[in-house]
């Protein structure tokens, strides 16, 4: 089932931050990986042509890829079926290589904020200066807790604008 659609960016790798593309957040009731069931698996799908395996799967078991014999194996850490559903925010906050906190993916199209907009405040915590990229990718940089947050961003007119986002 589709939980949301949006434009934006959220991935970063050796090639830098991905370009903004159409994203779809989808969830399936059950996903079976090498005979092991996972419940409520949600992921972000994109039309990017490169294959990706979420490293989050490693929290639930070990993966073996045998290229010589062309096989894939998954050895779960437990026999129970884990529920993997994790709510996501209406706006995914992202630090870009230029050092600014920005809206990565915007799932709720009704919000005034758009992908790429610079965020200057999260729950009263100001982000007037650039962030260190290493720190931003290894530590929690934004005070997000609970199921609701207030963020301020710079709108297209160059003015600060407030928006309330929710975790769903």
Residue ranges of predicted features:
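Pepsin/retropepsin-fold aspartyl endopeptidases
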Residues: 1-168
């Amino acid at each position: 089932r589709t939980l949301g659609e949006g434009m934006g960016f959220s991935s970063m790798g050796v090639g830098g931050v991905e370009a903004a593309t159409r994203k779809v957040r989808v969830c399936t009731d059950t996903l079976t990986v090498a005979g092991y069931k996972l419940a409520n698996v949600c992921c972000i799908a994109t039309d990017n042509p490169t294959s990706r395996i979420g490293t989050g799967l490693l929290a639930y078991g070990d993966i073996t890829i045998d290229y010589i014999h062309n096989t894939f194996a998954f050895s779960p850490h437990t026999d129970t079926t884990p529920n993997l559903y994790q709510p996501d925010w209406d706006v995914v906050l992202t630090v870009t290589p230029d050092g600014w906190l920005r809206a990565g993916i915007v799932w709720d199209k009704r919000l005034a904020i758009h992908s790429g907009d610079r965020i200057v405040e999260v729950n009263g915590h100001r982000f007037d200066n650039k962030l260190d990229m290493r720190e931003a990718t290894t530590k929690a940089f934004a005070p997000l807790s609970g199921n609701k947050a207030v963020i301020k961003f710079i709108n297209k007119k160059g003015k600060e604008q407030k928006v309330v986002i929710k975790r769903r």
